[in-house]
Amino acid sequence: MGKEERYTKKPKPDDRSDNVEKLQEMIHNTIENYREAEDYLKLHAEELSPEEIERIKEKNRNRLISIQNMRQEIIDEVHDRERR
């Protein structure tokens, strides 16, 4: 693909029709990862260094924040759909 060809392509239209479904799937996957990490800690905590334990706990804290943000995004998307 040449430079000219790359810059003459039109941008894809903004299709938000499946955003809620995508967000729900992302929430599901994030919750699953959270639970797997919790289970891993329960089973292997004595084998892990304090740094590794803290790293896993920090990831899970970040996952909880992400879940909250994605849930808010779903609410925003639903409100946006209602306005259309």
UniProtKB/Swiss-Prot annotation:
Disordered as annotated region, ranges: 1-20
InterPro entries: SASP_thioredoxin-like (IPR017524)
Coiled-coil regions, chain positions: none
Top-rank taxon: Bacteria
Transmembrane stretches, start-end: none
A Pfam family that the UniProt record links to this protein: Tlp
Signal peptide boundaries: none
The family this protein is said to belong to: Belongs to the Tlp family.
Protein name per UniProt: Protein Tlp homolog
